[in-house]
């Protein structure tokens, strides 16, 4: 008995005949999306392996899962004489939903990723081969996931980009809070918990939430976002290196070797570390050496006067008070795109 065909989407390329493409498209009540209702025998649709019951995912490379029937029809008609349809049968559709996978053309060629793969669908920056364990996730079996930033190209859809941006009080930066399934954000590879590094080539790590939102909206219909997942973020912070677009495909920063600082290896200026041993010699910017009080850097002194101690305690209480919320700007904490 032959083994069952593996589940995968199908990419159907249709060339229009004298009677059209030969299929009927319709929406189903209670189900999201557009479905193939009927395929005419001997038609271009049948020759392209389109089948009744298929759900339409993409038209000519554009995801249409969130579009209306009229919008989908117009996309099919937009390219004269031919069209490219990415579809899934019911069984494949259910498997994709169960595993929370976004359907792509790559899956039509390679099939669905292994069920045990924690990074499905496999991102562009995942490679295999021999790499340093400092720059990748260890895997005894051989494959390594390189810890690289990801450059996500988003083109705005009718419902926007399809992601929610928020700031976290416990840590600096802007984070992807959620990504809508089937949205431009999902198709670009953006994922929840990603930290935003750059918007359209500009570093936004030091910007306020409203400023980052303005940067994303600066271009009307598209955005280029450089992001890092939590593991990659931790790795680059450990090396004290700021991720850039060059790290997406170019050389990765090296870990500390023979006392060389990561910043020097990355081509930047070396900065002093707060983990230096107490009393160690350091060079000031003009090259002169000085001894550092091990408590001075943290704002403490070994022998404060009573007045100093009292003033310091008062200042610490003031600094701990949370700033009053400006309720007119409360919505800046979360922004939907």
Curated annotation (Swiss-Prot):
Residues that bear Phosphoserine: 130, 183, 254, 269, 280, 303
Superkingdom of the organism of origin: Eukaryota
Biased composition (Polar residues): 255-275
Localization per Swiss-Prot or TrEMBL: Endomembrane system; Nucleus; Apical cell membrane
Region of interest: Disordered: 107-144, 240-337
Composition bias type Basic and acidic residues, residue spans: 134-144, 327-337
One GO MF term: signaling receptor binding
InterPro entries: EBP50_C (IPR015098), NHER (IPR051067), NHERF-1/NHERF-2 (IPR017300), PDZ (IPR001478), PDZ_sf (IPR036034)
Alphabetically ordered keywords of this record: Cell membrane, Membrane, Nucleus, Phosphoprotein, Repeat
Membrane protein topology class: Peripheral membrane protein
GO cellular component: apical plasma membrane; endomembrane system; extracellular exosome; focal adhesion; nucleus; plasma membrane
GO biological process: protein localization to plasma membrane; protein-containing complex assembly
SMART domains listed in its UniProt record: PDZ (SM00228)
Expression sites (tissue/organ): Widely expressed.
Domain named PDZ: residues: 11-90, 150-230
Presence of the UniProt keyword Repeat in the record: yes
Subunit and interaction comment: Homodimer, and heterodimer with NHERF1. Binds PDZK1. Found in a complex with EZR, PODXL and NHERF2. Interacts (via the PDZ domains) with PODXL (via the C-terminal PDZ-binding motif DTHL); interaction is detected in glomerular epithelium cells. Binds ADRB2, SLC9A3, P2RY1, P2YR2, SRY, RDX and LPAR2. Interacts with MCC and PODXL. Interacts with SGK1 and KCNJ1/ROMK1. Interacts (via the PDZ domains) with SLC26A6 isoform 4 and isoform 5.
Function field: Scaffold protein that connects plasma membrane proteins with members of the ezrin/moesin/radixin family and thereby helps to link them to the actin cytoskeleton and to regulate their surface expression. Necessary for cAMP-mediated phosphorylation and inhibition of SLC9A3. May also act as scaffold protein in the nucleus.
PANTHER family, A to Z: NA(+)_H(+) EXCHANGE REGULATORY COFACTOR NHE-RF2, PDZ DOMAIN CONTAINING PROTEIN
Identification of the protein by name: Na(+)/H(+) exchange regulatory cofactor NHE-RF2
């Amino acid at each position: 008995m032959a083994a069952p065909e593996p589940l995968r989407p199908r990419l159907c390329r249709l060339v229009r005949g004298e009677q059209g493409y030969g299929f009927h498209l319709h929406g189903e009540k209670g189900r999201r999306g557009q479905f193939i209702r009927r395929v005419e025998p001997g038609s271009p649709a049948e020759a392209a392996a389109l089948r009744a019951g298929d759900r339409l995912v993409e038209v000519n490379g554009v995801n249409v899962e969130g579009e209306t029937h009229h919008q989908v029809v117009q996309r099919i008609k937009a390219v004269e004489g031919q069209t490219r349809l990415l579809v899934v049968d019911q069984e494949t559709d259910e498997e994709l939903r169960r595993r929370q996978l976004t359907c792509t053309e790559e899956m039509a060629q390679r099939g669905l990723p292994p069920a045990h793969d924690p990074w499905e669908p496999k991102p562009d920056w995942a490679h295999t081969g021999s790499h340093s364990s400092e720059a990748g996730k260890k895997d005894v079996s051989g494959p390594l996931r390189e810890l690289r930033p990801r450059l996500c190209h988003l083109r705005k859809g009718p419902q926007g980009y399809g992601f929610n941006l928020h700031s976290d009080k416990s840590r600096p930066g802007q984070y992807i809070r959620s990504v809508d399934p089937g949205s431009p954000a999902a198709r670009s590879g953006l994922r929840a918990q990603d930290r935003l590094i750059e918007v359209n080539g500009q570093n936004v790590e030091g910007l306020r939430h409203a400023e980052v939102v303005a940067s994303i909206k600066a271009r009307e219909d598209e955005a280029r976002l450089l992001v890092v997942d939590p593991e990659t973020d931790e790795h680059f912070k450990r090396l004290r290196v700021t991720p850039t677009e060059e790290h997406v495909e170019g050389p990765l920063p090296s870990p500390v070797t023979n006392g060389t600082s990561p910043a020097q290896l990355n081509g930047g200026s070396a900065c002093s570390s707060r983990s230096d041993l107490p009393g160690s010699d350091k060079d000031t910017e003009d090259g002169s050496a000085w001894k550092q009080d091990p408590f001075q850097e943290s704002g403490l002194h070994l022998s404060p006067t009573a007045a100093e101690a009292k003033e310091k305690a008062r200042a610490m209480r003031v600094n701990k008070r949370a700033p009053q919320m400006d309720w007119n700007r409360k919505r800046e904490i979360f922004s939907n795109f």
